Amino acid sequence: MARLPDNKPLLCYITDGRSLPARGGGLVPSSAAKTPSAAEGSGAEGSLGVAGPRGELLLLIEQAIAAGVDLIQIRERHLSTRALLALVEAAVARARGTATRILVNDRLDVALAAGAGLHLPTHGFPVADVRRAYPALLIGASCHNRDELHRAEAGGADFIVFGPVFETPAKKPYGPPLGLEKLREAVGAAKIPVLALGGVTLANAAACLAAGAAGLAAISLFQHAADLADTVRRLRALTSE
């Protein structure tokens, strides 16, 4: 089974490119524009060298890699297959030679084509089916209760993202926040790493780790950080306090 980076806590940045307005043209670095993926084609939709939120997202992914974020989960569900593949391929290329692992949400076809890992939502492919077919693939799984957790772990997931722990607009469809006690129970029931998700901030990250979480997964914590590298340093320091 694929090995996760050996960092404490594990940090997972979940992307949300739709919340990123282009700033200053939103252009990706010239090096990226010079080496487009074959999957990008010639259309503007697939190109990562154009101005716009996708250019900003790739820049953020580069910053997250440079800062030492362990896992980057790309979940741009609104993109076409071609555009998503181009983005994931570009992210994988930038992470090559580092400890950062790139995963794509729900899209097994894109993960395999780009050489990325796969993150499975509860409504996605069964973890066991994917693990059986692809023994070496890095697989994460979203879980909202212990039954889902046990099923994902038994199926061969490498790690669990559990939540929502705290109130967050992004997770309202999943009901009220589960809270730290449910997180603690999930950690106690699992033999694989459990990452806390949902409303995680610098202010409550320590409480998640005190509940036993092996790491933290978030959108805003990383994507809207004033200084991403400093945020990562502060989160890493929590395990040494």
What are these regions (language model features)?
Residues 1-34, 46-119, 124, 132-158, ...:
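Conserved N-terminal beta1-alpha1 strand-loop-helix module at the mouth
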Residues 170-172:
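Glycine/threonine-rich flexible loop motifs
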Residues 156, 211-213:
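As written
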Residues 1, 213-215:
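Structured catalytic cores of enzymes that bind and process phosphorylated ligands/cofactors
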